């Protein structure tokens, strides 16, 4: 198939061709994330803060589904590179079953404990009740997220990212349309945003399922009726999937701790500003995430084919494109910060944070300049099936660098919210240097071992 040929061709061309649809999809998703927050912010600062407080919960859902999805992409890509279709088919079958089990286990573990989790984060009053209302609906729909991302992983693994883009964009546009209808017209408030998200994910899932099971446009063949557990495949998916999931969980834990630090030096107002700044900054982060996602498939295929020089080319080219992209995005966000801030301060209940949000948008986006080194290196390790090394990078980045610098600047040095923003940037810079050196040494070792 053409998408498989692209994966095994020129690595620079492959990175661009595989990543383009994912970048488009993730860019549209970032627009949704922003629009979602804009509609919610119309309910007041407490509602926007509630979405921010829910971030660790949402990230943990994302961790389970996306972590498994990365494991699936890597597993299939490596087998495509090795030209072993039978094993790729087995990975796809295991993917769907494991996604179902993971989703059910998550619901059982998290849903009964939401109240306790938000209390531990230091949220209280209206902010806490709104956060529970917003996140509980999404938690109950976790199985939908996990199965949908498993199918995304199957298509990405074979380089068929056009289908990924179509399903994602249609789902996202549906979400954007449904948000104001559910939140305001149906008077569901913050719960309406959650219902809109679930319906959108279901639509994306149906599109992917149609392509895989009915149209059969996929390179791999999925026949669940012939599923037989294979411990070797399960172990392979777990080796990449669990560290990938833990990477997202470290981000959630980091935000959990960061929320506590923010509440120490500020209040729900400070959290609302931080949340707004992050949502706008996602415009820069999420396209890079799409580029790294494409790189995972390309690097996985080159690794499976044992073409380590191509792997090296794909790695450095992805970083180069990522840095150039981030420079442009950061410049635009900082230049347009007074205008962008109005996206979250357009009502009487939220206009009081406009000036603070503008200040945040002139500092926070700077961390994006160092993100390509981190995400590309993490994608490289995931692609070659060494997810535990990606986890090491994430722990160093989120739990050591971000938290340590934020606490140092905000609390110990008494810089308040400015310290939070500065800590994020300095932490990303430090983690970027570490990740890049780690990646370069790993590639040298691969080339030497051949």
From Swiss-Prot:
CDD domains: MATE_MJ0709_like. Belongs to the multi antimicrobial extrusion (MATE) (TC 2.A.66.1) family. The chain crosses the membrane at residues 22-42, 48-68, 91-111, 135-155, 163-183, 188-208, 245-265, 283-303, 321-341, 363-383, 400-420, 423-443. GO terms for molecular function: antiporter activity; xenobiotic transmembrane transporter activity. Keywords: Cell membrane, Membrane, Transmembrane, Transmembrane helix, Transport. This is Uncharacterized transporter MJ0709. It is a multi-pass membrane protein. GO terms for cellular component: plasma membrane. InterPro entries: MATE_fam, MdtK-like, Membrane_Transporter-Flippase. The keyword Cell membrane applies. The keyword Transmembrane applies. It is found in: Cell membrane.
